[in-house]
């Protein structure tokens, strides 16, 4: 979305400051839903801007975002995360309910075979050039493997009346 980005709801609360890679303030949480859902959105300002790409972390080229058509079960999907970078797998299930270790219950998640680790939460999922969602959580790690769940992006956009920023 222009002027902001979507992320996991467990990453912040409305009004919370968000900081960039250089530790300067880049924006503010405008909304967050957690638990029940796991999504939020951040408005950017102070010299920051958004681009319609998913960061490839030097492993692959950054992926242009051209839409948000939902990938079917069995489709290839990749994830970008600030801890582990770029990883790919397949869509395994949809509209799943997850009971996290802390007792939080989240509904409507998509399950994938993509690995993730702590700090990857809120990172983007993409299938081809279609945005899929943001990392909620999972089990395992990127050494031994595992599964992750993401909150579908179209639900987030709809919840806040946002429009996806596309290339």
State where each predicted segment sits:
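Active-site region of chymotrypsin-like
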Residues: 51-59, 85-167
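Serine endopeptidase catalytic core focused on the charge-relay Asp
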Residues: 1-98, 126-128
């Amino acid at each position: 979305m222009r002027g902001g980005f979507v992320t996991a709801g467990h990453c912040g609360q409305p009004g919370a400051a968000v900081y960039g890679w250089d530790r300067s303030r880049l924006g503010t949480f405008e909304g967050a839903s957690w638990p029940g859902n796991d999504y939020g959105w951040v408005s950017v300002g102070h010299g920051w801007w958004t681009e319609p790409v998913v960061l490839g972390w030097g492993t692959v080229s950054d992926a242009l975002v051209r839409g948000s058509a939902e990938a079917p079960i069995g489709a290839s999907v990749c994830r970008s995360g600030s801890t582990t970078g770029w990883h790919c797998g397949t869509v395994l299930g949809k509209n799943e309910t997850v009971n996290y270790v802390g007792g939080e219950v989240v509904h409507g998640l998509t399950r994938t075979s993509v690995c993730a680790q702590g700090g990857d939460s809120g990172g983007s999922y993409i299938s081809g050039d279609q945005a899929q969602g943001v990392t909620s959580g999972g089990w395992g790690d990127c050494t031994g493997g595992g599964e992750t769940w993401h909150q579908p992006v179209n639900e987030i956009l709809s919840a806040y009346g946002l429009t996806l920023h596309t290339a």
